[in-house]
Amino acid sequence: MSRYRGPRFKKIRRLGALPGLTNKRPRAGSDLRNQSRSGKKSQYRIRLEEKQKLRFHYGLTERQLLKYVRIAGKAKGSTGQVLLQLLEMRLDNILFRLGMAPTIPGARQLVNHRHILVNGRIVDIASYRCKPRDIITARDEENSRTLIQNSLDSSSHDELPKHLTLHPFQYKGLVNQIIDSKWVGLKINELLVVEYYSRQT
């Protein structure tokens, strides 16, 4: 299944706020109206919608998300929390959380078009897994810096998660540590996502 490129508002109306996909918000009460029209949700549908929420927020294909679930399942600790950490430490998501891109698809474009350096080297793979002490900067070119400045100027200036530091005048972000699950930028029940996949096998 390919990455979703359809109407974004349609997805947030059904699944709720997905800040990584779009900075738009569903109208108040729209999720309640949808639920009342469709009746009581089955447990399968609840798990499916949590999985879809995760997939659309981080802009992943079904195959990519399944791969992350399998990696998390082999790691020590809670599979759900490890899964969220893996997704949150992707380069495209780090750029989004720093405010250097308005959305995760926007961050992915910055990376794909070679506007971003990690530790002084161009990285053009959006799924690059960032680690503590990584230094993320814009290329020293006017076009790269203008794109990031536009995003910084229009960002909502929400409190940065504790694992990141931003130096806006240097177009630079620092990864201080692996993210703590309480700083994840999406309201999600990750255990339902893990349950969804465990029941598919």
Curated annotation (Swiss-Prot):
Domain S4 RNA-binding: 89-152
InterPro entries according to UniProt: Ribosomal_uS4 (IPR022801), Ribosomal_uS4_bac-type (IPR005709), Ribosomal_uS4_CS (IPR018079), Ribosomal_uS4_N (IPR001912), S4_RNA-bd (IPR002942), S4_RNA-bd_sf (IPR036986)
Region annotated Disordered, chain positions: 15-43
Superkingdom in the source lineage: Eukaryota
One GO MF term: structural constituent of ribosome
Pfam families documented for this protein: Ribosomal_S4 (PF00163), S4 (PF01479)
Cellular localization per UniProt: Plastid, Chloroplast
Swiss-Prot/TrEMBL GO biological process terms: ribosomal small subunit biogenesis; translation
This protein's UniProt keywords: Chloroplast, Plastid, Ribonucleoprotein, Ribosomal protein, RNA-binding, rRNA-binding
Main location (coarse class): plastid
GO CC terms: chloroplast; small ribosomal subunit
Family, per entry: Belongs to the universal ribosomal protein uS4 family.
Oligomer and partners: Part of the 30S ribosomal subunit. Contacts protein S5. The interaction surface between S4 and S5 is involved in control of translational fidelity.
NCBIfam families hit by this protein: PRK05327.1, rpsD_bact
Family annotation (HAMAP family): Ribosomal_uS4_B
Function: One of the primary rRNA binding proteins, it binds directly to 16S rRNA where it nucleates assembly of the body of the 30S subunit. With S5 and S12 plays an important role in translational accuracy.
Protein name, entry field: Small ribosomal subunit protein uS4c
Natural source organism: Panax ginseng (Korean ginseng)
